[in-house]
């Protein structure tokens, strides 16, 4: 089997387009392995961060589908489980509330499975926390509408979200997005001092991307409410 040294080097050097093209060529030539597919999923994730709108949506779906194929080939692969859950979550995040709830149970199962394989992965902890945060913030009307369409509406609380956001923080204390959502949980619980602490940490961190810059702006806005 051909190694992934070249594609991994392209990933490390952030040559994501070239790396994905190389792996697609290998797939077209008949290679179909879990290790190939989760790497394709990972490249799609990185490329999606440079896109917006419909282009980003299509890239997320493409990556999610590679991940699902990888999981079918090897359900015990942590990296396949991790990247599939991440991409599945990003796709679900773009759906309207009803569809988001419908796919939420499947996403939660994916996250739980991946975290069983590695309970310390901060990206997965953050994503599961985001799921809990979203469910906890559904309005009564949204829950009622969902219960009429689906057999079971997922249950989660702000405290559930806070546990996972804190666990992610313990693994990566300088993640602006996680600090933002930690502060939102504390604000929801009327814990303004803890929220201020997280927000003040976030606004002095360097923004590594345009998304980070937006999160910093939101953190500064939330500070006004503390």
Swiss-Prot record:
Q: What does this protein do?
A: Acts in chromosome segregation and organization during mitosis.
| The protein's assembly and partners | Interacts with air-2.
GO biological process terms, semicolon-separated: attachment of mitotic spindle microtubules to kinetochore; cell division; mitotic spindle organization
What are the recorded GO MF terms, alphabetically?
A: kinase binding; microtubule binding
Q: What is the recorded name of this protein?
A: Regulator of microtubule dynamics protein 1
Homology family: Belongs to the FAM82/RMD family.
Task: Give the matching InterPro entries.
Answer: RMD1-3_a_helical_rpt (IPR049039), TPR-like_helical_dom_sf (IPR011990)
Q: Where does the protein end up?
A: Cytoplasm, Cytoskeleton, Spindle pole
Example GO CC term: the record gives: mitotic spindle pole
- Mind listing the UniProt keywords for this protein, alphabetically? Cell cycle, Cell division, Chromosome partition, Cytoplasm, Cytoskeleton, Microtubule, Mitosis
Upon deletion of the gene, what happens?
Defects in cytokinesis, spindle orientation, chromosome segregation, osmotic regulation and merotelic attachments of microtubules to chromosomes.
Query: Key word Cytoplasm present in the record?
Result: yes
Species assigned in the record: Caenorhabditis elegans
Top-level taxonomic group: Eukaryota
Which Pfam families does UniProt cross-reference here? RMD1-3
Keyword Cell division annotated: yes
Give the primary localization class. Answer: cytoplasm
């Amino acid at each position: 089997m051909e190694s992934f040294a070249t594609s991994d080097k392209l990933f490390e050097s952030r040559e994501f387009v070239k790396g994905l093209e190389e792996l697609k060529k290998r797939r077209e030539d008949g290679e179909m392995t879990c290790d190939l597919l989760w790497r394709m999923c990972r490249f799609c994730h990185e490329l999606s961060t440079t896109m917006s709108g419909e282009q980003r949506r299509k890239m997320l779906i493409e990556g999610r589908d590679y991940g699902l194929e990888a999981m079918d080939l090897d359900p015990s692969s942590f990296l396949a489980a991790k990247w599939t859950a991440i991409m599945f979550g990003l796709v679900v995040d773009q759906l309207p509330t009803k569809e988001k709830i419908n796919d939420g149970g499947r996403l939660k199962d994916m996250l739980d499975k991946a975290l069983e394989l590695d309970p310390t992965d901060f990206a997965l902890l953050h994503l599961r926390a985001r799921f809990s945060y979203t469910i906890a913030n559904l309005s009564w009307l949204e829950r009622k509408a969902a219960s009429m369409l689906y057999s079971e509406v997922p249950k989660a609380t702000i405290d559930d979200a806070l546990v996972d956001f804190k666990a992610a923080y313990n693994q990566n204390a300088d993640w602006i997005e996680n600090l933002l959502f930690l502060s939102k949980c504390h604000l929801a619980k009327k814990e303004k001092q803890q929220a201020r602490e997280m927000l003040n940490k976030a606004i002095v961190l360097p923004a590594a991307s345009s998304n980070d810059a937006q999160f910093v702006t939101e953190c500064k806005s939330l500070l006004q409410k503390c």
